[in-house]
Amino acid sequence: MNSPVRDDHWLLSRLDYLWTKHFSDVDQKNKVFIKFGRAAKYRFGSIRLDPKKDASLILINGMFKDEKVPVKVVDHTIAHELVHYTHGFSSPHKKQYSHPHKGGVIDKEMLQRGLGDLIKAYKSWLKDYRKSLKPVVRKRRSRRLIRIRWI
């Protein structure tokens, strides 16, 4: 069975699905674009507001183009960014909190919206993903003795 190609059109369909099913009460007060960004080890998604274009841009980690990453993990990342949009971060909505992750508001909001299965799938995947990362070994720099001569 062929699965759809993971490209920006696929991301837009995932965003549309999540917004329609779980965020239908949230007004889209500006244009919202979504696309894959560059691959990164630790940042899976981001949202930013471009006031010149009156648009919000959601960037999803380019690593998520790989079908080895479960769809639920991609959906979790998109939903996470939609919660930021809902709470007024990088969107024209009124800011509801002083900090975007204050007191676990993202997971609380996602649970209220019936997205607990995405949280569970994401945390399970994240545990395995972290194990797959090679530990970074840093050599300690040896300290050189510097002699200062006073003349």
Feature-to-residue mapping (PLM):
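Active-site-proximal or metal-binding-adjacent scaffold patches in catalytic folds
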Residues: M1-D75, Y85-I151
